[in-house]
Structure formats: C-alpha cells, structure tokens
Amino acid sequence: MIILDNSIQTKSKAYSISKLITINTLGPEGTSSEYAAKNFITNFTLLQGVNSKLSLHDTFESCIEKTLQSPLEYTIVPHAYDGIKHFYMRPDLQLLQIFRCDTPMYGLAVRPGFEYTDDMLDKAVIVSHPSPINLIKYFTRKDVTFDLVNSTSAAAKRVKDGLSDIALTNELARQKYGLHFVKTFKSIPMSWSLFGKGEIHDEN
C-alpha cells in the first residue's frame, strides 16, 4: 500500500485521498513526534495535493491501533522508540516510507524563578521520556535518576504543574509550558517510519 497519484493503492483496491487521511503520532502538543508529523504533512502530503489531518495519542501503540482500523489512517514513529521493532514484525502493518526530520533542541528545563545549580543533578529526579535520557549522560557525565513519562511534552507539563522540578524536554514543549532552559544539549538527528495498514493473505 502506497500513496500515489492522488490515491492510496493496495493490491485489491484504490482509495481516493480526497476523503482525507489522518497522520497519527505521539502527543500531547509539543512532542518531537508532533513536530516531525507536521513536517511530513508540509513537505509530502500537501505537496502531493493530499488532504490530511494530524491526530495525537498517548502512546505509539494507540496510534497503531487507529492505523489498523482504516487504510486512510497512518502512523509516524521515530527510530529512537524502542518499541518500533514490534511494528516492523506485524503482518497487519506495512512500512510505507522512511524520512529524516531532526528534532527541536533538547535541554534541561525548570519553572521560572526556580534556582537551579549543577550539583542538583547528583540528587534530583529528572522527568523525561525514555528515548532521550542518554543526552544527560553524554553531556553532563553524571549518573542521574529519572522519572519516566510517555512524552517530552508530558515531562515539561509535570514541571509546569509543580510535580517535578527539572525536565529533559524539547524547545517546543519548553515554550508551550513557559519553562526556562538551564542547559541545552542538541537537536537530535532523527529518522522516522511511516506505517500504514497492511494486507494479510491466507497462505493455506
């Protein structure tokens, strides 16, 4: 199944993309996945004349469940996500495209007015999505304790809400929740996979 010439082609049927396709990825607003999905929509679907909308979910697994419901539903997943290996193995999914989209800047963020010092890294618990945590190891050389959440945006929100003091998050989430970077690390070079609904054929 591929997007081609204003239709979605499968072995058995062609679906008109004038019906609107949905790009699913990890939310909430402010995630690097949202950033990549918007980039994909701008640089691929719009240029192809494809009508599309973005839908954000709490997990990539929830995105995949939506994709399995319709050939008009797609999911974008970063290759840094450990669970992506399971998606490649599924016979009911199909890898349609791989593209590069570097993430926004990542760094350590705190609430305005919070007095941060570097020695806090020796004892503080940092809230983060699992995928980027090695940034702290490589840039600070410290063995840090983490409180893991579903997304970088969720990490930033926990700091905004006063549930945590320091988040490893990206620039979009930092801006969204009004936080302040006390350290910046890098924009992560990243590749992404686009999955669509596969076709299972009985081999018996």
UniProtKB/Swiss-Prot annotation:
GO terms for biological process: antibiotic biosynthetic process. Pathway: Antibiotic biosynthesis; bacilysin biosynthesis. GO terms for molecular function: carboxy-lyase activity. Its EC number is 4.1.1.100. It catalyses: prephenate + H(+) = 3-[(4R)-4-hydroxycyclohexa-1,5-dien-1-yl]-2-oxopropanoate + CO2. It comes from the Bacteria. It is an enzyme of class 4 (lyase). One of its GO terms (cellular component) is cytoplasm. SUPFAM superfamilies: Periplasmic binding protein-like II. It is found in: Cytoplasm. Keywords: Antibiotic biosynthesis, Cytoplasm, Lyase. Part of the bacABCDEF operon responsible for the biosynthesis of the nonribosomally synthesized dipeptide antibiotic bacilysin, composed of L-alanine and L-anticapsin. Bacilysin is an irreversible inactivator of the glutaminase domain of glucosamine synthetase. BacA is an unusual prephenate decarboxylase that avoids the typical aromatization of the cyclohexadienol ring of prephenate. Belongs to the prephenate decarboxylase family. This is Prephenate decarboxylase. It comes from Bacillus subtilis. The gene is bacA.
